Amino acid sequence: MPDEIIRRKRRLSSFQIIILGFAGVILLGALLLMLPISTTAGGVTPFNETLFTATSAVCVTGLVVQDTGSYWSAFGQAVILTLIQIGGLGVVTVAASLALLSGRKISLMQRSTMQDAISAPQVGGIVRLTRFILRGTFLIELLGALAMLPVFCRDYGWRGIWMALFHSISAFCNAGFDILGIEDNLYPSLTGYAGSPVINITIMLLIRDWRHWISDVE
């Protein structure tokens, strides 16, 4: 009996699990961004800068202290994009999807945490809803990338594939990150494509779909 009481006291609430999950992902992302392989210059980025960048990516705020396109290498950009995707989907949703892929069963407590994480109305059907969110998210992001692919490949060659994928995920997760680099000491972002109907319409639809996705889940 005393052991059961101790275990109950030590059990984390859904809110605590979500907070610790986000904090853990942010810290891991910050440490990965500190690696020399994460920058184009091959140097070590100060922890305060990588922590800020990782937090911004996971919390999808779009604030940066270094230009994402020119400062970070392909590896660093991949880390940032992964953090954006995790932040957009939610740490608990990503963890649950990995558990499902590995064939593990989701416990009732885990289902309750998933319910709180995505603001689902009930625990029943939460696993099915999570699968639906994952499939829908990846499908929409893929379609967005395919729509922008011809434009970016025309301007950047094979690198356009990565450009299309990055901006599709960033837009759908409403993250505000871009990898278009610096021109004349300015950060043009997507202003260079102000006259491109394909890029403009695709980005707008991706952002709009994200907002509708959130409202439908809630």
Segments predicted by a language model, with ranges:
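Membrane-proximal intracellular helices of multi-pass ion channels
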Residues: 1-218
